[in-house]
Amino acid sequence: MPPKTKGKGRKAATRKKKKNSSPGVEAEAKHRLVLLEKELLQDHLALQREEACRAKASEDRLKQRLQGLEAELERTQSEGRAVYAEMSRQRQALQKELGTRSKRLEEEVRGLRERLETCQREAKTAREEAERALREQDGTLTELRAHVAHMEAKYEEILHDNLNCLLAKLRAVKPQWDAATLRLHTRHKEQLRRFGLNPLDL
């Protein structure tokens, strides 16, 4: 826009000169004016081309930047999708593993509960059998003690009867033994005297 202002100033000066000049000078002034206008148009076109080039370069840079941003956005989205897919895969794998582990643990717990119930039943049965065996043993011991006490009483009675019978027999045969002993003693004394021995010296 300064060139236009400059042109206007020249036009005004030319007009002033036109009033005070001859026709030849006026033609020359018009020619100069045309040249100036042409120069101004050329400068204006050059400025427009320069501005257009700068705008085109700026547009190209913006397009390039936009393409870079779009590519980066696409790469980021692709990475995000890849990360999401990987996380989904890992989550599914983890859920599957947890499901398998949970199922295995449930089966182990079920098996342990069954074993515990079996052991409890066996322990209860063994305890009942042991208690029954102890009761039977106590009953048997009681019967044996009673039988032993009865046998001891019987044996003691038989022993006393036998001893009494033996004593009675001894008392019955004692006079006979005493007489036999006396006869034997007398016979020995006579035999000793026969051999010239004194029984009192022996």
Swiss-Prot record:
Start-end of Basic residues biased regions: 1-20
Stored InterPro entries: DRC12-like
Record has Cytoplasm as a keyword: yes
Protein name: Dynein regulatory complex protein 12
Organism: Rattus norvegicus
Coiled-coil region(s): 54-149
Signal peptide boundaries: none
Keywords for the protein's UniProt record, in alphabetical order: Cell projection, Cilium, Coiled coil, Cytoplasm, Cytoskeleton, Flagellum
Cellular component, GO annotation: cytoplasm; cytoskeleton; motile cilium
